[in-house]
Amino acid sequence: PAPAPAPAPAPAPAVDIIIPVYKDLEETQRCIQSVLRYARDNITASRLIVINDASPDSALTHWLRNEAKKQPGFLLLENEDNLGFVGTVNRGMTQSATNDVLLLNSDTEVANQWLDRLHAAAYRGANVGTVTPFSNNATICSYPRFCQENSLPPNYDTATLDALFAATHPGASIEIPTGVGFCMYIRRDCLQQIGLFDAESFGKGYGEENDFC
């Protein structure tokens, strides 16, 4: 008899995009709107989880609530007390037992097929646990000047520059000593093995992703 066909590989998990929010309405709007705008350009299944970390800004809270009502796939959580970055993203990462997670600072902007590229890099090998992209201002992931803020060139916006860089070395990835929490993709199997961020040791934040990696 003919050999049985090989089973199809299991589909990769969907992704929870987790954005902790505390202040700065304009930056938060740009971040969330960029995620929503480019969702249609990415085939990776995703859910947006925005967590208001007890913001004192009533205008920000009002905008988030209105936006969550209008947008499908937008889950808004509100902390009763300020938990800081670590406690807040830990809450986000427990909203699913199976989805991968992507931590995104509220002062970032994304563009084009950003999520598909991060997802592809995460599943390039079984030994990959986290993925962090380059950015114009992200310490060891700053590009082209390492550990410096790189202003956008004149007449370039985020999407235009992203498309240029994506075409320069398409699909390329390198190993780095640690992920950086401004935009950090974490595979669920990695999260299950390591556990959540260490809120007891790192309190309100800074250094928790280095400890995790």
Task: Pin down the residues of each PLM region.
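A conserved hydrophobic helix/loop-capping motif in glycosyltransferases and polysaccharide synthases
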Residues: 15-27, 31, 38-39, 51, ...
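Cell-envelope/extracellular polymer assembly enzymes that use nucleotide-activated donors
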Residues: 14-16, 47, 211
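Acidic donor-binding segment of Leloir-type glycosyltransferases
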Residues: 36-78
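Glycine-rich, basic loop-to-helix element that forms the pyrophosphate-binding segment
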Residues: 79-96
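A short, conserved alpha-helix in the catalytic core of glycosyltransferases
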Residues: 113-119, 174-195, 200-213
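A recurrent flexible, glycine/aromatic-enriched loop bordering the glycosyltransferase active site
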Residues: 86, 137, 150-189, 204
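Conserved donor NDP-sugar-binding/catalytic core segment of glycosyltransferases
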Residues: 109-149, 201
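Short aromatic/hydrophobic "clamp" motif used to bind/position activated sugar donors
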Residues: 101
